[in-house]
Amino acid sequence: MINGSIVALITPMNSDGSIDFASLERLVEFHIDQGTDAIVAVGTTGESATLPMSEHVTVVAQTVKFAAGRIPVIGGNGANATAEAIELTKSLSKVGVAGMLGVTPYYNKPTPKGLIAHYKAVAASTDIPQILYNVPGRTAVDMQPETVAELVGVSNIIGVKEATGDIARVKRLRELCGNDFKLYSGDDATAREFLLLGGNGVISVANNIVPKAFKAMCDAALAGNAELALSLDTPLRGLYSTLFCEANPIPVKWAAHRMGLIKCGHIRLPLTELSEQCHGLLIDAMTRAQIEVK
């Protein structure tokens, strides 16, 4: 399965809010050219919460089409209703994804028993590899390593994206889940340490705009070269924090637009475009990361 530098891809939109498929194709080509190891389409950064299911599936399918087998595409299949997640999973199973990424059900705060039942039911609806996704800062539920370990025996649940930023969890997850279970960081700021401690990859927001540099850092960390990984990570650290000066993906879409990667930075309500007070902060962070701003 997929290791390394994985982009949590933005979903480009036109000024009227419709999907900008021409920009989406350019983004896919950009990541292939820059050496990104895989793409996650329509996850959190791809605005999954504001795409209706039919549009969600269409964007993932088009991403797969544009990739044309040159880079693996993982489709987001999370929902806070298990039946809806199963319906989405069945639809995504038909479009050629290499895997799926399922966030823990949000808002309704399931217990560990509920999380286990949810993920087992979703996994049973497909034979495509499933990656669990823990991001309590958004979902209001924190899936503990012990709960993840209960799902290791499900044949097509192959890993977890852990986005708490708690580095101690890497060791605990590895102890409980074994060496074959994939561990992916979902926190750019701690990704280097995560990989050096035995993680397999990073599903990254910053990777949208610094893919070559981010991959170089990931490759160094995966090779165990801590000194090189640190030297490559240091110029990017200001970017990691500034990309969260407002809710993700507001800043990264604005940055991608300023780079000329997408036609406009439109984002769907209830999110709004980046406030002016953040513009200078983000331009400064981009400049320090050696990103050309247009």
From Swiss-Prot:
The record places the active site at Y133 (proton donor/acceptor), K161 (schiff-base intermediate with substrate)
Pfam families, per the entry: DHDPS
A GO CC term? cytosol
Q: Where does the record say this protein resides?
A: Cytoplasm
Single GO BP term: diaminopimelate biosynthetic process
The UniProt keywords, alphabetically, are: Amino-acid biosynthesis, Cytoplasm, Diaminopimelate biosynthesis, Lyase, Lysine biosynthesis, Schiff base
Source taxon at top rank = Bacteria
Q: Which reaction is the catalytic activity of this chain?
A: L-aspartate 4-semialdehyde + pyruvate = (2S,4S)-4-hydroxy-2,3,4,5-tetrahydrodipicolinate + H2O + H(+)
Q: Which GO terms describe its molecular function?
A: 4-hydroxy-tetrahydrodipicolinate synthase activity
Identify the residues that bind pyruvate.
T45, I203
What does the record give as EC number? 4.3.3.7
Q: In which pathway does it act?
A: Amino-acid biosynthesis; L-lysine biosynthesis via DAP pathway; (S)-tetrahydrodipicolinate from L-aspartate: step 3/4
Q: What class of enzyme is it?
A: lyase
> Where is the site described as Part of a proton relay during catalysis found in this chain?
T44, Y107
Q: Could you describe the subunit structure of this protein? A: Homotetramer; dimer of dimers.
What the protein does comes down to:
Catalyzes the condensation of (S)-aspartate-beta-semialdehyde [(S)-ASA] and pyruvate to 4-hydroxy-tetrahydrodipicolinate (HTPA).
Its family remark reads: Belongs to the DapA family.
What this protein is called in its record is: 4-hydroxy-tetrahydrodipicolinate synthase
Species the sequence originates in: Shewanella sp. (strain W3-18-1)
